[in-house]
């Protein structure tokens, strides 16, 4: 059931990350060129693109699952990856096992611990994120309202706290936090104007850090440190030129500040440093793959043997399939290849362009999928957006530079690149995310065959339903009906404009590629380093805090306690108690993860319902929204625990 859910929820990832960029380019004034919008969608075009994306994502999702058969052998059998955070799911499965085997009291205690911390997490997030205070046309979380109320002029809590983040002093405008320190000619002396330091109040990142421990968490943060304390300040300090879509020219970054100031560090990060980070993710991943070439050769040899009819270990006589048949991998590759050509040709693109996309998809899903699996296994975070940028770069590089040969207009080239990247996002997400299902199956005895089967069953409904909702929200986002950050979609839209106008700094990608290779050679975790550089300090710092907290807890609290037990009851009892005590902390961490997951899901649903209400600021809706939210969570808790 869990594997089917994984397939259903991640088959539409590409639509969530990439597809909204199409509507932003068509409707958002920020991406208009001097000649008008880069993309113009006629009646029926959106439906046509959605049809192509949904059907193609199904096949791509199947391919992603097939490729993981190879990755499972490499990074779960030959060279196992830790996958921080999988312990939480494993503990939940352990609770279910206790119930089935009669250990009901132990299961109840475990479930109670997780439930208590889930509740504490949701209450905390309710105060931090739920729009409890409605004033005029603004909806504020309680903590944001307190911060703004406790501010006088440019001084007060709002300067150091906003939107769930405790951050460096940023200043305020009318009592509202500016979020980031503004750079201007008058504030050029301020070191905070060149970087962004803070801590996001996210329990899940602390929990993941707890699972990681200090070393792995530090390596992820090392990329963040290099990005935010070295590269970003350099870009701002040396007035590095960045591309401006409206003027269609490279503009020195300090020119954006004008006389009033601007958050140049965020501009430097989004326009330059993230490009280096993407290169680092790919460079570290490629070098890591090169180090594992012998293992890959052995697996490809097994696939070749399976195609020749030679005996293999995936089928057990009298017991059935243990692993999905290896011979199906090339069959799925061929099926996906020709399906992509057919789908995109029916969708109105030339056969040659469809052929090129199909080839890129087959190749990149394997190579970048391997990188995604590795990053997911090392950090618990999947770099879907980073790897998708590489695919978009490849597709636009080919389509925009061979428009006459491929019979493509500039609009067609952009659309094909974005739809193709959407499809890739679904494939890469399936390859990377399913590692959690397979990791848990190793511990509980499920056959990989059944996990693969569940993943495949979930792809079709997930692609249809998830894509439908994502498209609906994309249209509303572009029209301005709803306000969402959509950082990945905006980044893809910006990227598309840059390449359509033949601008951009490809050498930054190459620089990042070399940096990622070096860190992979030096530490063995170049992809984690690149991912850290891709994220902001407030997002990664909680992981480091969590990892350091666990090491300190083990050293100061756990070790003395275990040493005492060892003296009194012997080594065997001490090791047993150590495992039980450590598992109890995993249950707390599981509660933190579960609480944030529940709250995030419910908040997304409520935000969606907000768009359907005639007057989203009506008092009746305020009461109904709040009462519904509370009753929903009380009901869920009652059903689980009573």
Feature-to-residue mapping (PLM):
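Alpha-helical multipass membrane-protein architecture
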Residues: 1-642
């Amino acid at each position: 059931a869990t594997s089917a859910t994984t397939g259903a929820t991640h088959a539409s990832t590409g639509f969530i990350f990439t597809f909204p960029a199409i509507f932003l380019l068509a409707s958002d004034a920020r991406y208009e060129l001097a000649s008008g919008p880069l993309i113009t969608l006629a009646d029926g075009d959106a439906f046509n693109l959605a049809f192509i994306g949904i059907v193609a994502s199904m096949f791509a999702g199947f391919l992603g699952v097939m490729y993981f058969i190879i990755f499972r052998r490499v990074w779960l059998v030959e060279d196992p990856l830790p996958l921080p955070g999988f312990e939480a799911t494993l503990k939940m499965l352990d609770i279910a096992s206790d119930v089935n085997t009669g250990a009901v009291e132990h299961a109840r205690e475990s479930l109670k611990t997780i439930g208590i911390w889930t509740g504490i997490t949701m209450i905390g997030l309710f105060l931090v994120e739920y729009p409890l205070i409605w004033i005029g046309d603004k909806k504020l979380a309680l903590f944001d309202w307190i911060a703004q109320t406790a501010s006088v002029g440019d001084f007060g809590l709002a300067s150091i706290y906003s939107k769930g983040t405790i951050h460096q002093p940023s200043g305020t405008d009318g009592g509202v936090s500016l979020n980031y320190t503004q750079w201007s000619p008058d504030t050029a002396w301020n070191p905070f104007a060149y970087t962004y330091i803070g801590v996001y109040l996210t329990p899940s990142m602390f929990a993941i850090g707890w699972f990681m421990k200090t070393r792995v968490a530090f390596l992820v943060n090392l990329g963040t440190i290099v990005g935010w304390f070295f590269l970003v300040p350099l870009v701002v300090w040396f007035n590095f030129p960045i591309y401006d879509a409206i003027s269609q020219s490279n503009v020195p970054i300090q020119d954006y500040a004008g006389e009033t100031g601007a958050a140049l560090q965020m501009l430097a990060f989004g326009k330059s440093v993230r490009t280096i980070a993407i290169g680092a993710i790919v460079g570290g991943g490629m070098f890591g793959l090169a180090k594992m070439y012998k293992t890959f050769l052995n697996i490809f040899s097994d696939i070749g043997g399976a195609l020749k009819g030679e005996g293999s270990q995936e089928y057990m006589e009298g017991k059935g399939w243990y692993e999905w048949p290896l011979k199906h991998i090339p069959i799925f590759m061929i099926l996906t290849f020709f399906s992509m050509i057919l789908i995109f040709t029916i969708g109105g693109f030339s056969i040659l362009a469809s052929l090129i996309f199909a080839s890129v998809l087959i190749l990149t899903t394997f190579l970048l999928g391997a990188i995604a699996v590795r990053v997911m296994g090392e950090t618990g975070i999947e770099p879907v957006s980073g790897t998708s940028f590489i695919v978009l770069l490849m597709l636009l590089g080919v389509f925009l530079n061979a428009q006459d040969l491929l019979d493509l207009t500039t609009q067609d080239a952009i659309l094909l690149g974005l739809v193709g990247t959407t499809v890739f996002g679904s494939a890469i997400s399936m390859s990377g995310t399913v590692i959690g299902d397979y990791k848990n199956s190793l511990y509980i005895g499920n056959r990989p065959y059944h996990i693969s089967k569940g993943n495949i069953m979930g792809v079709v409904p997930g692609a249809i339903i998830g894509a439908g909702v994502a498209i609906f929200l994309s249209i509303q986002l572009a029209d301005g009906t709803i306000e969402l950050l959509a950082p990945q979609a905006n980044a893809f839209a910006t990227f598309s404009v840059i390449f359509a106008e033949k601008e951009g700094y490809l050498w930054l990608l190459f620089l990042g590629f070399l940096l990622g290779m070096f860190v992979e050679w030096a530490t063995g975790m170049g992809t984690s380093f690149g991912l850290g550089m891709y994220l902001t300090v407030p997002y990664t710092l909680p992981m480091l805090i969590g990892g350091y907290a666990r090491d300190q807890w083990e050293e100061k609290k756990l070790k003395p306690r275990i040493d005492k037990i060892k003296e009194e009851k012997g080594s065997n009892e001490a090791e047993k108690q150590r495992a039980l005590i450590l598992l109890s902390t995993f249950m707390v961490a599981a509660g933190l993860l579960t609480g944030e997951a529940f709250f995030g899901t419910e908040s997304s649903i409520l935000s969606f319902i907000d768009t359907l209400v005639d007057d989203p600021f009506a008092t009746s809706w305020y009461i109904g929204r709040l009462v519904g939210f509370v009753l929903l969570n009380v009901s869920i808790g009652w059903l689980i625990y009573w």
